[in-house]
């Protein structure tokens, strides 16, 4: 972040993505705090782009109350963007199928500026998707409300 702070986003069993912040280069971290972004105890991936914006690849779903581990369906995989790492807007839905499962996302930005995403596709394959961040248009604001 421009102020030198570090923000770590992580999965949680509490139906929201959790975060911790360091203001001393990672020597110490704040207590975990739940964000507004939904999470069903599934893996997430965040990336700070070369232009300073942030991307988040995650399952847009909350957990199942009947499961003590918090896991829920992983049939929606969203890509979100943020200017500050706190407020997120939908860029697009990468996958959405009633019976699908899309999990364990990963992202990198290569020297040509493109963002490469990979994730498990229906627990069968690993899918690779490439996007140009210059073409990403923020849409609606995202939160777990209404899920």
Where is each model-derived feature located?
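Asp-box/BNR beta-propeller blade signature and adjacent active/binding-site loops
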Residues: 1-147
């Amino acid at each position: 972040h421009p102020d030198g702070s570090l923000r770590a986003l992580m999965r949680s069993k509490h139906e929201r993505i959790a975060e911790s912040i360091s203001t001393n280069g990672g020597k110490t971290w704040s207590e975990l705090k739940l964000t507004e972004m939904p999470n069903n105890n599934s893996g997430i991936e965040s990336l700070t782009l070369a232009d300073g914006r942030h991307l988040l690849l995650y399952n847009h779903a909350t957990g199942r109350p009947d499961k003590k581990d918090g896991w829920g369906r992983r049939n929606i995989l969203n890509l979100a963007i943020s200017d500050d790492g706190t407020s997120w807007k939908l860029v697009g839905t990468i996958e959405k199928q009633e019976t699908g499962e899309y999990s364990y996302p990963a992202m990198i930005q290569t020297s040509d500026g493109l963002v490469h995403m990979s994730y498990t596709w229906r627990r069968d394959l690993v899918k690779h998707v490439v996007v140009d961040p210059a073409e990403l248009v923020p849409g609606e604001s995202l939160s777990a409300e209404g899920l």
